[in-house]
């Protein structure tokens, strides 16, 4: 089966595992998924990220994070720019997700950045997803 939107698939797998309160999630690896997973770890949405190399494409293992009473750290994930409708923004028009409580993941000329990092570096780009 041909996957037309691997980013949306990755976000959906995280959302589903999060709703089911799974501790670990494994997805087929790609550079963009590694970048998104690293941002999620850096911003504190997941505990840890491991990349397992094999002879094929590799696997990304994401360790989901939950609060003290089992509440989810990731409330929701939303794909913004899709293959059928790309969404680009300038640095001055960069969206704030829930007034800064969430993050936007932006693909820029300097790689994947959060909305805050893109604003600081004065770089626009393609808004891939919102996470809060």
Curated annotation (Swiss-Prot):
Subunit relationships: Part of the 30S ribosomal subunit. Contacts proteins S5 and S12.
Record gene name: rpsH
HAMAP family: Ribosomal_uS8_B
Family: Belongs to the universal ribosomal protein uS8 family.
Lineage of the species this protein comes from: Bacteria, Bacillati, Bacillota, Bacilli, Lactobacillales
PROSITE patterns linked: RIBOSOMAL_S8
Protein's recorded name: Small ribosomal subunit protein uS8
PANTHER family: 40S RIBOSOMAL PROTEIN S15A
A Gene Ontology term for the protein's cellular component: ribosome
């Amino acid at each position: 089966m041909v996957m037309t939107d691997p980013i949306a698939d990755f976000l959906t797998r995280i959302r589903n595992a999060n709703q089911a309160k799974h501790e670990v999630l494994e997805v087929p690896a790609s550079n963009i998924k590694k970048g998104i997973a690293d941002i999620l770890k850096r911003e504190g949405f997941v505990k840890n990220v491991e990349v397992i190399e094999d002879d094929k494409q590799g696997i990304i293992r994401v360790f989901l994070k939950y609060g003290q009473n089992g509440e989810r750290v990731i409330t929701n994930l939303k794909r913004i720019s899709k293959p059928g409708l790309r969404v680009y923004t300038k640095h001055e028009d960069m969206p704030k997700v829930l007034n800064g409580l969430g993050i936007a993941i932006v693909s820029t000329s300097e790689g994947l950045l959060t909305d805050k990092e893109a604003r600081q570096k004065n770089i626009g780009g393609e808004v891939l997803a919102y996470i809060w």
